[in-house]
Amino acid sequence: MERLASFGNDPFDKPPCRGCSSYLTEPYVKCAECGPPPFLLCLQCFTRGFEYKKHQSDHTYEIMTSDFPVLDPNWTAQEEMALLEAVMDCGFGNWQDVANQMCTKSKEECEKHYMKHFINNPLFASTLLNLKQAEEAQHNETAIPFHPADDPPRPTFDSLLSRDMAGYMPARARLSSRSFDNYAEWDLRDIDFVEDDSDILHALKIAVVDIYHSRFKREKTAGRKKIIRDHGLINLRKFQILERRYPKEVQDLYETMRRFARILGPVEHDKFIESHALEFELRREIKRLQEYRAAGITNFCSARTYDHLKKTRDEERLKRTMLSEVLQYIQDSSACQQWLSRQADIDSGPTPAAPIPSNSGRRSAPPLNLTGLPGTEKLNEKEKELCQMVRLVPGAYLEYKAALVNECNKQGGLRLAQARALIKIDVNKTRKIYDFLIREGYITKA
C-alpha cells in the first residue's frame, strides 16, 4: 500500500516542494540526478532555476504526471492506480463501493476493466514468469574475468616525472607523504636555548620558532594534497593540452582563475571556464552574423561566398606594396609625378589641400544627392557636406571612418600613407576624408 500511495493524486501523500514547501500537484518536476530522497520541485520553482546544496539548475529532470493512458485509452494512469487502491480497500467483488471511492467510473466499468486487464490478461502472467527467470539468472552469473594491469610507473621522489605528477605514487594510488615544505626544520635545527642568552638573542630565537610554526600551519591549512586530488592535477601535460583547445581570450581567463581554484570546487571551476568559453563562442558567432547582416546577406549560401571573397581581398591587400601603387601610374608621366609629389608632402607634414589643375578640360562632377541613401540619418551636417563633395555614399563613408578610427586607436596616430593603405579608393578622396577626420578630431596625426 505504501508503494501505491506514492503514486496517488493526494498532494499530502507526496513530499513538499523543496523550493517553496508547497504541496505538489501534477504536473511537477523530479530531479533525475539527486536523491534519495527524491528532489521534487513545483513548476514555479523549476522555471526560476531553484538550486539547493548539491542540486543545480542544469541537472536532468523528469516531468511527473499520470494524465496519460496505460492499458486502456479511456483510463488514465491516475485512474488505474485509484482502481487498484479501491480494490485493496474495499475488497475484490465489491464493485459498488469501488465505484463510489473512485467517483469517476461506474460499477460496470470498474468490474469490466479490472477483469479484462488484471485478471484475464496474459501479459501479467508472462511478466511474472520473466521476473522469476531474471531473479534466478542473477544467482547464476559467471565470474567476471580479470586481467593483470600494466605495471604502474614508480618514479623517485626527486625525479622530473615525480614533480610533473605532483608527488603521486601510482603503485600505491596516493600522494607522497613528504611535505611540500620538507626542509622547514633546517632553519631551527641548530637553535639552542641557554640561560645566558641576551634578551635580543632570546627574542630572535623565539621569532624563528614562530616562523616555523606559521609555515607548518600554512602547510596544513593550505590543503595542497586535497586540491591536487580533487582537481586531478596529476598529469600537468594533460592540462596544458586541454588549455590549448581554448581561444586566447579564454586561455587568459583560465590563467587568471587558476589561483581561485582552491576556493571553488573542481566541478564549479570547470563550469565557470566552460561557460565563459561558450559565451565567447556565442559573441563571436553573433558578431559574424551581424557582419553578414550589415553586408546584406540573408542566407548561409551567400555567406560562404562572402567569406571566400573576403579572404581573397585580404590576401591581395597583404600582397600590395608601394611598388604596386607606383605601377598603376607608370604609363602616365603626369599622374606618376603627382603621386610622387603627394608622397613627398606626406613626409614633409600636413599642407593645405590645393586643387590640382586638370589638363583634361572636363567639368567637375555635381554634388551627390544623398536623399534616400541608407546611412544618411547617421551623418551630421559636415559629414553630409563631405559626402556630397567627394561623391561618396554614406554607408561607404561610415565604413572608411570606422576603419581609420580603429587603426588610429591601435597605433596611437595615423599617417596619410597608412590611410591610403587601408582605403583603396581614389587617393584624392582619401586625402579629403583624412584631412576632414583630423580637422573634426576623430583621429590624430602620427
Curated annotation (Swiss-Prot):
UniProt domain SANT: residue ranges: 70-122
Chief subcellular location: nucleus
Family annotation (Pfam families): Myb_DNA-binding, SWIRM, TADA2A-like_3rd, ZZ_ADA2
A GO molecular-function annotation: chromatin binding
DNA-binding region: 429-438
Protein name (database record): Transcriptional adapter 2-alpha
Domain SWIRM: 359-446
Keywords of this entry: Chromosome, DNA-binding, Metal-binding, Nucleus, Transcription, Transcription regulation, Zinc, Zinc-finger
One biological process term in Gene Ontology: regulation of transcription by RNA polymerase II
Function, as annotated: Component of some complex with histone acetyltransferase activity. Required for the function of some acidic activation domains, which activate transcription from a distant site. Binds double-stranded DNA. Binds dinucleosomes, probably at the linker region between neighboring nucleosomes. Plays a role in chromatin remodeling.
Domain of life: Eukaryota
InterPro entries found in the cross-reference section: ADA2-like_ZZ, Ada2/TADA2, Homeodomain-like_sf, SANT/Myb, SANT_dom, SWIRM, TADA2A_B-like_dom, WH-like_DNA-bd_sf
Residues that, per the record, bind Zn(2+) 2: C31, C34, H55, H59
Keyword Disulfide bond part of the UniProt annotation: no
Binding-site residues, Zn(2+) 1: C17, C20, C42, C45
Location of the protein in the cell: Nucleus; Chromosome
Cellular component, GO annotation: nucleus; SAGA-type complex
Disordered: annotated segments: 345-375
Residue spans, zinc finger ZZ-type: 12-69
Record-linked Gene3D superfamilies: 3.30.60.90, Homeodomain-like (1.10.10.60), Winged helix-like DNA-binding domain superfamily/Winged helix DNA-binding domain (1.10.10.10)
